[in-house]
Swiss-Prot record:
Keywords: Ribonucleoprotein, Ribosomal protein
Coiled coil feature spans: none
KW Ribosomal protein (keyword) present: yes
Gene from which the chain derives: rpsI
Pfam families: Ribosomal_S9
Lineage: Bacteria, Pseudomonadati, Pseudomonadota, Alphaproteobacteria, Hyphomicrobiales
Family per record: Belongs to the universal ribosomal protein uS9 family.
Sample GO molecular function, one term: structural constituent of ribosome
A single GO cellular-component term on record: cytosolic small ribosomal subunit
Gene3D superfamilies in the record: 3.30.230.10
Protein's recorded name: Small ribosomal subunit protein uS9
Regions that span the bilayer: none
Domain of life according to the entry: Bacteria
Single Gene Ontology BP annotation: translation
């Protein structure tokens, strides 16, 4: 860039060389399933999705049995509803660690990532909805000299 800019028009006329947006390809195994792992708190979910009638199996059990609370089942369905693919994919997942809320969040994260592996064009919709972002909030550790992470022991003035 040896010549100097004289106006803003010249600056906007310059073509900036930006790298092209990365292209995502369909990643499917020999059985026609897309695989992804999802994490939330201490829970880790391994998720496989394939085209089907919309059945969801969690740890070899129906989703209604494993996640009895409707809020948790709704959390799991959110990525499919946001992508307008509810009832079009069968979901099989194994989840371990954490409690039920963390496990539901891990399954939701895994379903979102598996959907992008199966249909890369859904990535924008799921990213905008915040389903592909790993929720990094974990339990704060307990500190010595304290009763819990932040709670102090009872203080007596006299």
């Amino acid at each position: 860039m040896s010549e100097t800019m004289q106006s803003l028009d010249q600056l906007s006329a310059l073509k900036t060389t930006q790298p092209d947006a990365p292209t995502y390809t369909k990643k499917v195994d020999k059985f026609g399933r897309a695989y992804a792992t999802g994490k939330r708190k201490d829970a880790v979910a391994r998720v496989w999705i394939k085209p089907g009638a919309g059945k969801v199996i969690v740890n070899s059990r129906e989703v209604e049995v494993y996640f009895a609370r409707p809020v948790l089942r709704m959390m799991i369905q959110q990525p499919l509803v946001a992508a307008a693919r509810a009832g079009q994919y069968d979901v099989i997942c194994t989840v371990a660690g954490g409690g039920l809320s963390g496990q539901a969040g891990a399954v939701r994260h895994g379903i979102s990532k598996a959907l992008t592996n199966f249909e890369p064009e859904l990535r924008g919709v799921l990213k905008k909805g915040g389903f592909l972002t790993r929720d990094s909030r974990v339990v704060e550790r307990k500190k010595y000299g304290k009763a819990k992470a932040r709670r102090s022991f009872q203080f007596s003035k006299r």
